[in-house]
Amino acid sequence: MSDFGADHAFAGAASKLKEHYGIAVPVSAVRGFTEEHGAAMLAQEKQKSDWPNHAGVPVLITEMDGSMLPVVEVAEPVLGEARRDRRKTRQVSWKEARLALVHPPGSVTPRFGATLGSVEEAGERLAVCAWEAGAGSQTKFHGVGDGAVWITEQMEAQFGTQAQYLVDFYHLCEYLSAAGEVIAGNDKPAWMEKKKKWLKDNRWKDVLGTLRPYLEPANIPEPAAPVRACFRYISNHVNFLDYKGALAAGLPIGSGEIESAHRYVFQNRLKIAGGWWKVENLKKMIALRVLRANGGWADYWSKVHQEAA
């Protein structure tokens, strides 16, 4: 039942139970059973512990990012208050869910961690993933992403001097492309290729030098100042632009892996039309989806059956 509920809207899961097994189950029962086991999986999540003393694997690739998921709040009944239609008290909004992944170079089975909580909690989930992926006292961590401050700060907080971070090359190139429209016009394709080669050779100072003469005046609003935006983005991330070193080491310079993971871990189930979640239930479903993505589904149910025996 929870297998279907993990992948399909609860009404659809009930229909599949009827279709495949000839069992008629109320939608509320599917929801309750699925969320019950999601809560158990959430409670079983490993917590951050002291870093292991052994050397660990040489290198781990780490990525972390957030995406918005739909949440709903409904006013709770007040003792002594006249009965009312609580549906009229619904307030819908969006809440950021942070997803982390870690794996050795060449691996296609990352360890995932996720939270609806603070950036510090997200960092702890990242650290747990690293530990599960074989991290140790000598492991080097190669982080890649959009350069958000909360991510770079957590990389440093969790891994210290063992970590290096790289701004997603393709994300930076989006800024560069917008600037190229202004600077190069019809010659933009050739201009872009040249600047990409410079960046991959760590010649970001030369890129800034090319942008500088075209910087828009300060009184030009941000949406109309793509050169200034690109110049600022590069200037703010100069410590995270070692593309030459990453390429030489055979390490990724793009973070498409975490972007794809948001779709198949979170969004395919938790961001569907008409689906709004209470925060406490969303936490359970996230834990359930992460456990499945980590390949822990069979082990979980084996333990459940052993305890029931």
Model-found features: residue ranges?
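Catalytic center-proximal scaffold of phosphoryl-transfer enzymes
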Residues: M1-A309
